[in-house]
UniProtKB/Swiss-Prot annotation:
MF-aspect GO terms: mRNA binding; structural constituent of ribosome
GO cellular component assignments: cytosolic large ribosomal subunit
This protein's name: Large ribosomal subunit protein bL12
Signal peptide positions on this chain: none
Keyword Ribonucleoprotein applies: yes
Length: 119
């Protein structure tokens, strides 16, 4: 079978048949059809394009009761759950929020004396 005959055979296949062919080739030769990922310079670009942020309570500070109230307001947790979260710092308060939401939460918590990190 020539290369041209193989190409013609592939052209006549359906998408499902092509998918099966790719899987069979991967199994037969121990390779994957995944595209290579560029590693160099990726970390700097990823940091610049970050769209989801985690708000982490680093410490409650001196005004623990006010921090618990703020945590309850932000998260909607009950009193017991909010107290446990504040007592077990550092702890993520909210994950996967926008930069604006994260900055707003950070400002509210720092206003009552908490130490907060946005990651």
């Amino acid at each position: 079978m020539t290369k041209e005959q193989i190409i013609e055979a592939v052209k006549s296949m359906t998408v499902l048949e092509l998918n099966d062919l790719v899987k069979a080739i991967e199994e037969e030769f121990g390779v994957t059809a995944a595209a290579p990922v560029a590693v160099a310079g990726g970390a700097g670009e990823a940091a610049a394009e970050q769209t989801e942020f985690d708000v982490v309570l680093a410490s409650a500070g001196a005004q623990k009761i006010k921090v618990i109230k703020a945590v309850r307001e932000i998260t909607g947790l009950g009193l017991k759950e909010a107290k446990e979260l504040v007592d077990n710092t550092p702890k993520a308060i909210k994950e996967g929020v926008t930069k604006e939401e994260a900055e707003e939460m950070k400002a509210k918590l720092e206003e009552v004396g908490a130490a907060v990190e946005v990651k």
